[in-house]
């Protein structure tokens, strides 16, 4: 006795298996993240802690109301709105113990020492595989002084490969 399987059933199962295969491949690739993207999320605080009072408030005589205002501006939220002419709270202000330099780029406060889209100056974008290290676009995949992220140095004699020290 031979069991006959209809052609439509065979076609449907093969089509279904192909669809499942492509769905699995598509979802697994979208979840994979480059190592430097993960580092950005870990090292990215929500606020800039200012090293000095913004120039917009430096001429104000200190009263009880302005003390509250000045203490509010000791930290600036990332991407806070600004205006170059009328409300420039981040015009060359140093933050995070000198590791950040804030400028008003397209109506938002940006760190020109570490922002890939505003590296060194407003609007200067770093290319693929580059990060903004101290205001300079730097390739971090094979650089032993900036391996995978800015200022991560490999030990002497150890190569930086694909963003990892001693990758093998």
UniProtKB/Swiss-Prot annotation:
Keywords from the named record: Apoplast, Glycoprotein, Plant defense, Secreted, Signal
Record GO biological process: defense response to bacterium; jasmonic acid mediated signaling pathway; regulation of jasmonic acid biosynthetic process; regulation of salicylic acid biosynthetic process; response to ozone; salicylic acid mediated signaling pathway; seed development
Sites carrying sugar chains: 59
Primary location recorded for the protein, binned into one broad class: secreted
Source superkingdom: Eukaryota
Similarity remark: Belongs to the STIG1 family.
Subunit structure of this chain's protein: Interacts with PRK5 and to a lower extent with PRK4.
Name of the featured protein: Protein GRIM REAPER
Annotated organism of origin: Arabidopsis thaliana (Mouse-ear cress)
